[in-house]
Structure formats: structure tokens, C-alpha cells
């Protein structure tokens, strides 16, 4: 009958799917049913048994968590400009590293032949990393610009940080005395001192011409140009005082006690900021009598006791960066407490290299060699320029600075040079990996 009625079984027809053991015997309506069609079967929510028997779906109900995408999957116009700016800086740095005399033991870094080759062959991963480095450099420049004037020069050495302890290193004839006066007249030490104590081994060592130069330049540094051809004093004193003292007077016991009425420094600090300048005193500093308290203990007591004393500065001149005689430990303590080291390029290269090796341990070797090359260039081509190292700069761009009578105090941005060298290493690593995989591919083809 079935054959006659055309109800023949189809060949190769699959059997009915077996009942799911987890399925309820009686169908139950879905949690959200159609109110107009109550009997209409709807898909159940996750966790419910379906109302009809069907194969389990091969796809999960929950969508897979999408993977994080790259920051940039294409290079737009602004990114191309950033990369071009970075590329120009990289070319300048790589050329400087290649041409400097200290580059003999430096590892050469591979690079693209042109900016167009970098864009076409660099790849998304490399270009994104370079853009991140460029963004970091831009942020560093923005943060540093807050402390610079319109010409890009630093406006101060200490930016009101107290106490200000500085060491000046340089041989005879490199302009140390002129530098000390320029620090006062250019207002690179803030606040401006109202009293300057000039310490020498003997008082009669200073010629009258130098005394007149000191008095003139500290007076010049006490004023700024105001409106309508007026001048504005920068301290509470119209005429700052210049006091000469011998090293023996400095080391009197009464001058260590801030409560003593005969303490000459306390009397001056009760009226305003003070500065102590020690010149030609290296032999006395190497003696047995210690004066290290002038570098750490004495300033804190003086600043706490006299509110008008908003600034305490000590500047010590040394002819040798590593003197053999330091019986009292004064020079060693000075180097530890000094926040600023002002170095003449005329200092012996062996002493310079030792100082650079100690204070550039966080920088790549190439940047340390670049700094040595900068010192060497100014040693051969300039006379009265200085390189300044700040242990506690207000911004990382100002760890190393360059002081010129013509250009002023300029940051050297060695931290940015380190980031640029990091970008060169990133390019070198990419090209090296590609060459290694190319060699591996050709070796397998053989």
C-alpha cells in the first residue's frame, strides 16, 4: 500500500535523531514567549532545555572574546609626519655616532637606506613601535618646555631647590672666576643672594679689579628691567653685600653654631638669602679640619631658624676632580652633597672619562661615548664653555646641560638621545631578524 500511495522510503535516508537524555519529556514554553502566539515555539535562553529536539549547535552560544587590535593598523598623514621627524633625528644621531673618534668599539647598527624604504618595508609592528617612541619624545619636550624661556634656554640652575651645593672643576685659566660672577649676574641661582661671602686662603689674595667686578655683577644680578626704563630689585636689598673672608675665619667654631650671636652667616641669613663661594681653597679643603657640615647639617638649621633666609648656596672651586690629598674628607663629602657639578672641558680627559662613566650608568654605551666626544670637541674648539651635570634636575632633560657665554644654559636632552638610540636598536633588530629568517629559508630550500 505504501508503494502504491507513493510513500516509499528514500534510500540512504538518515534515521530520526535519538532523544536527548538531558531534554525534558514534556515540552515547556520558552522564558520569553510571543503573547500573540502562545503556542509558537521560540528558542530558549542559555541554560534552558529547548522545546524541540535538534542537534547541538557546533557554534558556542557566547561570542568569542575579540582579540585586542593594534593601536594603528595604517599610517595616516599625521603619523607620516611624526615618522619623518623621527627619521631625521635618527639620521643625525647615527651619523654622529659613526663619525666620532670613540666609535671604534661601537657595534654598527643596520638601518634602512631611505625614509621611503622604511615606510614600505618597515611593517606595522616596527612602525607602531617607532611612533610610540616619537610620542614619548614629544611628551618629554612638552614637559621640559615649561622650564625654558622663549629661546629654549634654562632659566635657572636650581629652580628654587634648597640648599644649592655646587662644585666647579677646571684648571687654571679656564675662566672659573668669571663663571662664578656670571652665575650671580645672570640670575641662574634663585633666589638671588643678598649677601655673598667670598672665601680665599688669605683676604689679600683678591686684586682690587676683581673685587670691583664682583660688586658690580652681583648688583647687576639683583635687578631686572621693568616698564618705562625702570629696574625692579629681585631681593629685599637694594645693594647686595660682598664680604671677603679667609679660610681660617670660615672654620671658626662660632660660625658653626647658628645660635651664636657672633656667627657671621647667621647674622646675614636673618636678613635674606646668602651664598658662600670658596675659591683657591683646594689645599685647605684637603687638610685635617673638616667643614662638611657646611654642605649638609648647617644649611638645614639655618633655613629653619631664619624664615627670611629663603636661599642657601655654596659653590666650591676645585682644580682637580680627583685630588690625592683629602685627609678631612671634605672633598669626598662635597661630591656626595653637590647637586650640580660644573666641569670645564679643559679638565684632563682621564678624569672626565672617569666622571662620565660613573654618572651615565643608566644610559646606553653609545650615549656615554657621545658625551665624551662632546667634551673632546669643546676642549679643542672653545675656551670658556662649561658642561653641567645636575643630580636632581627639575626635569630629566636637564641632567646634562651646556653653559656658553653666548648661548646661555641649554639642556643637552641626553634622555631623548637615549630614546633615539633605542629606536635605532629596534630597526637594527628587525633587519637582523629578517636576514636570519631569509638565510634559514634558503638553507631549507637546498
UniProtKB/Swiss-Prot annotation:
Residue positions binding ATP: 170-177
Region feature DNA-binding, mapped onto this chain: 439-446
Q: What is this protein called?
A: Packaging protein 1
Does the keyword Cell membrane belong to this entry?
no
Region entry Disordered, spans: 1-72
| Functional note | Component of the packaging machinery which encapsidates the viral DNA into preformed capsids and transcriptional activator of the viral major late promoter (MLP). Binds, along with packaging proteins 2 and 3, to the specific packaging sequence on the left end of viral genomic DNA and displays ATPase activity thereby providing the power stroke of the packaging machinery. The activity of packaging protein IVa2 is stimulated by protein 33K which acts as a terminase. May be the protein that pumps DNA into the capsid powered by ATP hydrolysis.
GO process terms (BP) = DNA-templated transcription; nuclear capsid assembly; regulation of DNA-templated transcription; viral DNA genome packaging via site-specific sequence recognition; viral release from host cell; viral transcription
List the record's Gene Ontology CC terms alphabetically.
host cell nucleolus; host cell nucleoplasm; virion component
Q: Name one Pfam family in it.
A: Adeno_IVa2
Induction details: Expressed in the intermediate phase of the viral replicative cycle.
The molecular function GO annotations come to: ATP binding; DNA binding
Basic and acidic residues compositional bias, start-end: 32-43
Compartments where found? Virion; Host nucleus, Host nucleoplasm; Host nucleus, Host nucleolus
What is the source species? Canine adenovirus serotype 1 (strain CLL) (CAdV-1)
Q: Which family does it belong to?
A: Belongs to the adenoviridae packaging protein 1 family.
Family matches, as HAMAP family: ADV_PKG1 (MF_04057)
Nuclease: present as a keyword of the record?
no
UniProt-listed SUPFAM superfamilies:
P-loop containing nucleoside triphosphate hydrolases
Q: Write out the biased-composition intervals (Polar residues).
A: 10-21
What keywords are annotated for this sequence in UniProt? Answer: Activator, ATP-binding, DNA-binding, Host nucleus, Nucleotide-binding, Phosphoprotein, Transcription, Transcription regulation, Viral genome packaging, Viral release from host cell, Virion
Provide the assembly information. Homodimer. Part of a genome packaging complex composed of packaging proteins 1, 2 and 3; this complex specifically binds to the packaging sequence on the left end of viral genomic DNA and performs packaging of the viral genome. Interacts with protein 33K.
Amino acid at each position: 500500500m505504501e508503494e502504491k500511495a507513493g510513500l516509499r522510503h528514500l534510500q540512504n535516508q538518515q534515521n530520526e535523531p535519538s532523544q536527548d537524555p538531558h531534554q525534558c519529556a514534556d515540552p515547556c514554553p520558552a522564558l520569553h514567549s510571543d503573547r500573540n502566539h502562545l503556542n509558537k515555539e521560540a528558542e530558549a535562553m542559555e541554560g534552558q532545555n529547548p522545546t524541540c529536539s535538534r542537534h547541538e549547535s557546533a557554534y558556542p552560544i557566547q561570542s568569542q572574546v575579540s582579540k585586542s587590535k593594534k593601536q594603528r593598523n595604517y599610517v595616516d598623514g599625521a603619523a607620516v609626519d611624526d615618522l619623518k621627524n623621527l627619521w631625521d633625528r635618527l639620521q643625525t644621531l647615527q651619523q654622529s655616532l659613526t663619525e666620532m673618534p670613540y666609535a671604534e668599539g661601537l657595534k654598527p647598527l643596520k638601518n634602512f637606506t631611505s625614509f621611503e624604504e622604511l615606510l614600505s618595508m618597515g611593517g606595522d609592528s616596527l612602525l607602531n613601535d617607532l611612533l610610540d617612541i616619537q610620542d614619548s619624545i614629544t611628551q618629554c619636550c612638552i614637559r621640559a618646555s615649561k622650564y625654558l624661556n622663549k629661546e629654549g634656554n634654562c632659566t635657572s640652575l636650581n629652580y628654587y631647590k634648597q640648599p644649592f651645593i655646587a662644585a666647579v672643576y677646571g684648571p687654571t685659566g679656564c675662566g672659573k672666576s668669571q663663571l662664578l660672577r656670571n652665575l650671580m649676574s645672570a640670575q641662574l641661582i634663585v633666589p638671588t643672594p643678598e649677601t655673598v661671602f667670598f672665601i680665599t686662603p688669605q683676604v689679600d689674595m683678591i686684586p682690587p679689579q676683581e673685587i670691583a667686578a664682583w660688586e658690580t655683577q652681583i648688583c647687576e644680578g639683583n635687578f631686572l628691567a621693568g616698564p618705562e626704563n625702570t629696574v625692579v630689585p629681585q631681593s629685599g636689598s637694594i645693594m647686595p653685600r660682598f664680604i671677603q673672608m679667609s679660610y681660617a675665619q670660615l672654620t671658626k667654631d662660632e660660625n658653626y653654631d647658628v645660635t651664636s650671636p657672633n656667627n657671621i652667616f647667621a647674622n646675614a641669613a636673618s636678613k635674606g638669602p646668602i651664598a658662600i663661594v670658596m675659591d683657591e681653597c683646594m689645599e685647605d679643603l684637603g687638610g685635617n679640619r673638616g667643614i662638611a657640615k657646611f654642605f649638609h647639617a648647617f644649611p638645614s638649621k639655618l633655613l629653619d631658624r631664619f624664615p627670611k633666609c629663603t636661599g642657601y648656596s655654596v659653590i666650591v672651586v676645585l682644580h682637580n676632580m680627583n685630588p690625592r690629598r683629602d685627609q678631612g674628607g671634605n672633598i669626598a663629602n662635597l661630591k656626595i652633597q653637590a647637586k650640580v657639578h660644573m666641569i670645564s672641558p679643559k679638565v684632563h680627559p682621564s678624569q672626565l672619562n672617569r666622571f662620565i662613566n660613573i654618572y651615565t650608568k643608566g644610559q646606553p654605551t653609545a650615549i656615554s661615548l657621545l658625551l665624551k666626544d662632546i667634551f673632546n670637541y669643546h676642549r679643542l674648539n672653545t675656551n670658556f664653555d662649561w658642561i653641567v651635570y645636575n643630580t636632581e634636575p627639575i626635569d630629566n632633560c636637564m641632567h646634562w646641560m651646556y653653559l656658553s657665554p653666548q648661548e646661555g644654559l641649554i639642556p643637552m636632552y641626553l634622555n631623548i638621545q637615549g630614546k633615539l638610540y633605542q629606536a635605532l636598536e629596534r630597526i637594527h633588530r628587525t633587519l637582523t631578524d629578517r636576514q636570519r629568517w631569509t638565510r634559514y629559508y634558503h638553507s631549507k630550500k637546498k
